[in-house]
Amino acid sequence: MINLDIARRRMVENQIVARGIKDRRVIDAMLKVPRHIFVEEAMSAQAYSDSSLPIGEKQTISQPYMVALMSGMLQLTGKEKVLELGTGSGYQAAILAELADRVYTVERIRPLALRARKALDSLGYLNVNLKIGDGTDGWASEAPFDAILVTAGAPDVPMHLIDQLAVGGKLVIPVGNQSEQTLVRITKGENGAVSREDSIGCRFVKLIGRYGWSGED
């Protein structure tokens, strides 16, 4: 029987810290949040492997390193209001809940949203607000957000998401074609000015919705 606590520590040491993640708050969050709670019980032994894993509905839970990297790119201090688009398993939302003050997350697939809510509730994450809907719309009624994290690959950066950012806020999103993307960080400055930084190449499931890919693409 695998010791999941030891497996989680080794995941952080070998996959996160060893690859250059230095943000202590991100490291502590990855050490704390039990990834195995967010996958099917039959896959618990693989929960801390260096890979994404299927969670049903043709969706995946992201590779731990990618979760840590994207979380760190938001540069959270603990006071922020954060929007996540694409709840999936709920694992990324749990990490954000450790790093920010409030988390708002949107999932288009109802069964995934319900499972994620159950997992988040079981761990006591009362600062996570989840709704079912088209995540590409964002969550305009709760804007502005200090940070927005998109967990699926988009064809381009949706400008209305930048509109939902507070001044100084950051949007992290994979942008590219349906098979390969680049991790992009947008920072919103005064008077609506934006700056863009491109990071590493990545592969995410498609961002499906009005401002993403169609489900038939």
Swiss-Prot record:
Domain of life: Bacteria
A Gene Ontology BP annotation from the UniProt entry: methylation
Active site: 62
Record EC number: 2.1.1.77
Gene3D superfamilies xref list: Vaccinia Virus protein VP39
GO molecular function: protein-L-isoaspartate (D-aspartate) O-methyltransferase activity
Family annotation (NCBIfam families): pimt, PRK00312.1
UniProt protein name: Protein-L-isoaspartate O-methyltransferase 2
The species this protein was found in: Geotalea uraniireducens (strain Rf4) (Geobacter uraniireducens)
